[in-house]
Amino acid sequence: MDLTTTSHARVDSGGVPFTSSLNDPTPPKLSASIALPAHLHLLAKAYGIPESHILQLAWALAANEQNARTAQWEHLELDERQAISWVLRHWQDPSVHRYLSPDELRGDKHQIPATVMAVVEEYSLFQTLALTGSETEIGMCFHPSTEQPWLRVIWNPEGMLASSASRLTRALESALHAVFLTPHVKVGDLTLFSIWDHQQILQWNSHYPQATDRLVHELFKDVVDASPQANAVAAWDGELTYRELDRLSSRLSGRLQDEFGVQPETIVVLCFEKSVWAIVAMLAVVKAGGAFLHVDPQHPAVRHQAMVQTTAAKLVLCSARTRSIISASVPECTSLVIDRRAFSVEPDHVQHETLLSSQNLSPRNAAYVVCTSGSTGTPKAIVVEHASLSTSVDAQANAMEISSGSRVLQYAAYTFDVSVGDIFTALTHGACICIPSDWERSHDLAGAINRLNVNQACLTSTVASILSPAEVPGLEKLTLGGEPATRQCVDAWAEQVRLKNVYGPAECTVWCMIQPEVSRHISVSNIGHGIGARAWIVHPEDHDRLMPVGAVGELLIEGPLVARGYLNDSTRTDEVFLSQPPRWLESFGPTPSRSRFYKTGDLARYGPAGALLFEGRKDTQIKLRGQRIELSEIEYRLHRALSDQVATAVELAHPKGSTAPVLAAFITWDQGIDLQNVQNVTLDARQEFEELASRIKAEIEQALPSYMVPALFIPVQTLPLTTSGKLDRKSLRHFCSQCSHEFLKKLDDSSPADAAPKESANPAEENLARLWAQVLERKSESIRRGDNFLSLGGDSLAAMRLVNLAARDLRLTLTVADVFNSPILADQANLLRPLVQTKHIAPFELVTDGDLPIQDLMDSVAKQCGLTSDQVEDVYPCTPYQEEMVRDSLSGTRTQMGQEVIQLASDLDLSRYLSACARVFQRCPILRTRFVEISGKLLQVVIREDISWQRPTSLAAYIEADNQTPPTLGKPLARWALTEDSTHLVLTMHHAIFDGISLGQIFGAIYAVYQSIPLPQVNLTFATFIGKIYRPHHDLPDASKQFWRSYLSPTAGSNDAPLSDVERASRPCANSGTQRLVTFQAGAVKALQQHGLTEATLARAAWACTLARGRQSPDSDVIFGTILTGRNIHLPGVDALAAPALAHTPIRVRMAAAQQEKPAHFLARVQADATAMIPFEHDGMDRIRALDEQVRVACDNMRTLLVIQPIPEGLILDSKSPFPGTMLSGPRVEAREMRHFHWYGLLMECTLLPMDGFFVRMSFDDTLYSPEAAERLLDEYSQTLHELAHGLTVDGSTE
């Protein structure tokens, strides 16, 4: 095999002839030759050294340059202050200053060090060495001659790429050139940058990135104008189109200018949990001319104070949930809650638009500020201008393939600048930004991605590794960024999605480098090429010196996306933001005068085709799980917590056998370990140090975010130093790499080495311990019942992994809050609960067990509805309550229709209002629901149709006619009418398709759409709810039978009197009514809460007492009917279900002991009975009545119905009653009673009020109750409510 390559002669500028094969058009495969000057032997003789020493020094210089004086070449310790000639005379480094004889080479190949030079005289020996598989990656063969000495570099293709070997050989050439021609130059001033390097870099960096010199909200407005109805935000708490987001943000921006004086360069703090309102706030601030700064509500108050002090902010926009937190942290700031209530008043649009357009806002003004860790303990506030952000989002959208079809996950924390990239890149390019809740981020990220239909995400490798491609089949593109990519993560995702790898410090406006096509064959350190930027590799200590291709140096970013600098910190700004371009820049062609440069502090090198390879940091800044951390800031906090006599250091530790790095704090301690003698460490009890470590940790937790608090505190006798007297951080990292996580943890554990054996654990604890071991990368047998998850190195991401593993592997539920609130293994195991998964019900799934095939069923349903089968969207069974309502209305005794008459406000935008109604009609399938009967079974059908309006000329005539129109199978059960003069709206709905809560959801949604307020995401369908409670067979389960027979069994006390002849002849109809507002004395509701009681329990118990007082035997049991909300079942999203979840059940209250019980005990007993009923509340009154004769009699003799309901979200109490349309349209025409509702002679509605009381409305049959008797009954009920409530407040629980 011929290892040689053709050589070509060339002459360098100094006139010294060299011969090299590196200019071959075909890259060398195994070797390259360099012809040396003939006077080499004379030069060696002049210095009094062997010729090989000159070559070895040149080799050392080349290797040192290529590796930036790091890694395996640190041991060379060249004195950079000395001239090359001085080094030639004095330098003696035994590690490379060796002559390998032929005999040595013929020996054991494993004794030859890898990646070092060997100097031999016989080329054939080196050839043999390469061919026999030596571990030596590269070496050189020197052939001395007084006529034509030459040097051949040879490398092992299995250990080194040809391109890497070529670069090192080229560097060797340059080093030889310097040694021969410029021996007077100091080693530190030596540059091996060649013409070839210049030409290669010029080719890669020939084009200056395109700048987008515009305001970022102008880019957003372009999308609004082009696609106003496209989805802009899909969040867990609401959805917005581009037009709606534009309107809301413009309204808020006008208010910020009007009321708070926000103008260019005003910094506004934002403190939000994940929410659609955070997006509105961000956009509003930039529209107003200000710059936003996010703070994390979970960070310590000291952190909030430091950030506000750094930025001199005066205004905070926050959520209702975070307001108390931020107000306590920075009370000097004005806080403004941003939620849907903030937009309840219609603004003066003209005035606001004028304000916006009158601002003297420039792309040079600040758009946002982001704070990062600072070495002095003070956060660094990075100011990013509009032009930088606009340039960044344009470049990122193009490189990351974000467009109108993208649904982009917004996962990153708002304090992490990646969130800015997620949000503004999507919103300026027509994509939809998808926002899971904080709970979903931690507990069900895969589920959130699927529910939000996310097809593109940007995550750290740590978070991406929690997911698996199989869990998120709709995810098409995944971008890794924020921390170095891992091989494990790349291998998992590379063949499943379009995988990209990005890089970018916050000072460069999110991302400035991208590797767009990541595969298993590309190095995980490959961060690709610049996007919106040019990348340069400069000397780590001198940015005016470019590094040769392949040499490791500091990454310097140039371009319009570089930030302005650090706010009010010119010292630190001048350190890393160049005020003048580097001297070498002119040689690469013209550059805009405003070009900016940022010294990243990251080490990198040019790889194949100019792609950059990330190599680490040159200083004490690190990234841990995507968070940028200055180790010196943590050391600063440690120093403040300790005396001056105690030395400290913090390092990122990679314990042996663990892939999860942790922060380790080293503290000097008399009884500490000797880092030079780790093998002989004894783990004696160190109670005093443990107490010290606990105190320090508690103190710095008050000042630093949790991700900056060390997980390990290690006592050491002394901190290691380099020969120059600096802290030897490499030795600290090396020490940690030699020790397991368990060993390092024991160093600050007070438990002795011979601690008692592991306590016995129950199966739940053993299973959980195995998951701990997997997450924390420990041996499961080392985890004890009393171990603390957080003390063992757990953090929020580890908790997320634990929660996901518990659900996936154990089918058990655990929350992140559980992990943090109960970090002890034994306590945590007690919190494990069976996993309850919400099964999504597909269309027609609940009717597939019938006699008819699906298509035949659809045809039959369509025929009954007078429609075609393609208009049938879904079919599913009725709830027991719905079936009751429909059967009763079909009997002809009552219509079961509810009617709302709304007087529309005179200034209402009618077109917009009707459009809002139409959108909600489509959003809520229950409004498009009809009922049919197939084979004697009632089914409900969802129809694909548009809203239909009736336009009556007379309101009174329409109401009368509408009341006389009975419901019919197959026909719509929601009727919408708008009077011809557009003054009144009438909505008539069957009670089978709404309840109080769903009515509030419907009218609240109409109001929200009208006001351009985002609608919450629909996570639960009515079909899924029915699937949860549905029983395909009529008979009740045995557990239900047993419960109801026991609950309704006969008692010694008399029940209600038998039904009268009048009642038997005609069921009652509650056709009259009265109402009352009942408020409690101060402290009543608080007393309820202190006893663990609810207001609903109070209402129920008071009604039982009221009915009992009217009896001849007040101590006899009371039985009455009730309508329950039906939303007590464990089903996420059931509280916001826009459909009737009601359940009709009997209530029995045993009164025999009530006279002797204290109010608290009586109420507790009533509440316990209600709780016991929860699993059976959807059994249905008809099925309950059918159990046996005694149960039927008890149910038939119920005379009254009690309905307890909260004010649904979005409702307002007017002078007469709670009404969902009040906010939008004005008061109701009349307070219509819920007549024709059920067969009870008296109906009591109790609506729970937020101001400690009830709104009570009584409807009654005036043939059974006189108005005077009804008023007296209502008075008695009000008095009983007061008595019971007062009884709780007197001496805790006395009567």
UniProtKB/Swiss-Prot annotation:
* This protein's domain notes: NRP synthetases are composed of discrete domains (adenylation (A), thiolation (T) or peptidyl carrier protein (PCP) and condensation (C) domains) which when grouped together are referred to as a single module. Each module is responsible for the recognition (via the A domain) and incorporation of a single amino acid into the growing peptide product. Thus, an NRP synthetase is generally composed of one or more modules and can terminate in a thioesterase domain (TE) that releases the newly synthesized peptide from the enzyme.
Positions of the region Adenylation?
221-624
Instruction: Give a yes or no for keyword Phosphoprotein in this entry.
Output: yes
- Top-level taxon of the source organism: Eukaryota
Pathway connected to this protein: Antifungal biosynthesis
Name of the molecule in the record:
Nonribosomal peptide synthetase resC
What residue stretch is flagged as signal peptide? none
Cofactor(s) listed in the protein's UniProt record: pantetheine 4'-phosphate
Q: Which GO terms describe its biological process?
A: amino acid activation for nonribosomal peptide biosynthetic process; secondary metabolite biosynthetic process
| This enzyme's EC code(s) | 6.3.2.-
The Carrier domain extends over 759-836
State the CDD domains in the record.
Answer: A_NRPS_SidN3_like, FUM14_C_NRPS-like
Function comment: Nonribosomal peptide synthetase; part of the gene cluster that mediates the biosynthesis of the tetrahydropyranyl antifungal agent restricticin that acts as an inhibitor of CYP51 and blocks the ergosterol biosynthesis. Within the pathway, resC catalyzes the C3 esterification of restrictinol with glycine to yield restricticin. ResC represents an example of the emerging class of single-module NRPS-like enzymes that perform esterification reactions.
Catalytic reaction list: restrictinol + glycine + H(+) = restricticin + H2O
In its UniProt record, a GO molecular function of this protein is: phosphopantetheine binding
Q: Does the keyword Iron-sulfur apply?
A: no
